[in-house]
């Protein structure tokens, strides 16, 4: 990743700490992956703290595919099968079947309905019957070990939410440009500045977690 583009957001460690602080205070962050990977920026929120206004922003400026990033333990609690038995996608993105809250929604597609679905799915006592399948929210199963085992936006979302003191669940959506094309680093950074969101890269987060692990050992 071009560090010059990111210089306004601090050093790699500062970027991670500012992202954690933003989530802790109920704000969203922009997460960039490597230029050699998807080279995309995702809007990321802690699922537990996401607001209706943030969901509306996500739908308005994103791809429309709003994803709930969860652990495999949560996936099993909700009895959500994987979307396919053989994942042939390039980066092994682990979609489960899509979901909708069984109660409290209309068509399921509005910002309020999607937020209701997410809140139902992450509730401590959530059970399979709380959700209908299919729906308009796309759960993603994170890999155990987070970004240290897979350098994906899914794992970064869960890791960041956890570091901020929330349940291990994040909401993400890819940022798109006005013409419908995918936003890359320059557009992501411009969007982040406009909406007062920190920017962090997955490599930043991985290095931060590796450093913490070394200090703890």
Curated annotation (Swiss-Prot):
Which InterPro entries does this UniProt record tie to the protein? Answer: DHBP_synth_RibB-like_a/b_dom, DHBP_synthase_RibB
Classification via Gene3D superfamilies = DHBP synthase
* GO BP of this protein: riboflavin biosynthetic process
Which annotated residues bind Mg(2+) 2? 38, 153
The pathway that the record names for this protein is:
Cofactor biosynthesis; riboflavin biosynthesis; 2-hydroxy-3-oxobutyl phosphate from D-ribulose 5-phosphate: step 1/1
Note how many cofactor molecules are bound and how. Binds 2 divalent metal cations per subunit. Magnesium or manganese.
Enzyme class label? lyase
Query: Which residues of this UniProt protein bind Mg(2+) 1?
Result: 38
Asked if the record carries the keyword Phosphoprotein, the reply is no
Per its Swiss-Prot or TrEMBL entry, what cofactor is needed? Mg(2+); Mn(2+)
Q: Which reaction does it catalyse?
A: D-ribulose 5-phosphate = (2S)-2-hydroxy-3-oxobutyl phosphate + formate + H(+)
What does the record give under GO molecular function?
Answer: 3,4-dihydroxy-2-butanone-4-phosphate synthase activity; magnesium ion binding; manganese ion binding
List the keywords (alphabetical): Lyase, Magnesium, Manganese, Metal-binding, Riboflavin biosynthesis
Instruction: State its Enzyme Commission number(s).
Output: 4.1.99.12
The protein's job, in short, is: Catalyzes the conversion of D-ribulose 5-phosphate to formate and 3,4-dihydroxy-2-butanone 4-phosphate.
Family named by the database record = Belongs to the DHBP synthase family.
PANTHER family, alphabetically?
3,4-DIHYDROXY-2-BUTANONE 4-PHOSPHATE SYNTHASE, GTP CYCLOHYDROLASE II-RELATED
Assembly and partners are described as: Homodimer.
Name by which UniProt lists this protein: 3,4-dihydroxy-2-butanone 4-phosphate synthase
Species for this entry: Yersinia pestis
Task: Please name the taxonomic classification of the source.
Answer: Bacteria, Pseudomonadati, Pseudomonadota, Gammaproteobacteria, Enterobacterales
- Gene name, please? ribB
């Amino acid at each position: 990743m071009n560090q010059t583009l990111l210089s306004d957001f601090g050093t790699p460690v500062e970027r991670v700490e500012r992202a954690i602080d933003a989530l802790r205070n109920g704000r969203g962050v922009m997460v960039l992956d490597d230029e050699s990977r998807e080279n995309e920026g995702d809007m990321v929120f802690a699922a537990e703290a996401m607001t209706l206004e943030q969901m509306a922003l996500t739908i308005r400026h994103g791809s429309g595919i709003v994803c709930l990033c969860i652990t495999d333990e949560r996936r099993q609690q909700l009895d959500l099968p994987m979307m396919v038995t053989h994942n042939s996608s390039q980066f092994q993105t682990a979609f489960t079947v899509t979901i909708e809250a069984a109660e409290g929604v209309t068509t399921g597609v509005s910002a309020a309905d999607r937020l209701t679905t997410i809140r139902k799915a992450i509730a401590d006592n959530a059970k399979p019957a709380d959700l209908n399948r299919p729906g308009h929210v796309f759960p993603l199963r994170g890999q155990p070990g987070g970004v240290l085992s897979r350098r994906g936006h899914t794992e970064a979302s869960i890791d960041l939410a956890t570091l901020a003191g929330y349940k291990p669940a994040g909401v993400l959506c890819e940022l798109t440009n006005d013409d419908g094309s995918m936003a890359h680093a320059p557009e992501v950074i411009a969007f982040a500045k406009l909406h007062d969101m920190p920017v962090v890269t997955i490599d930043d987060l991985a290095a931060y977690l590796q450093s913490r692990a070394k200090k703890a050992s």
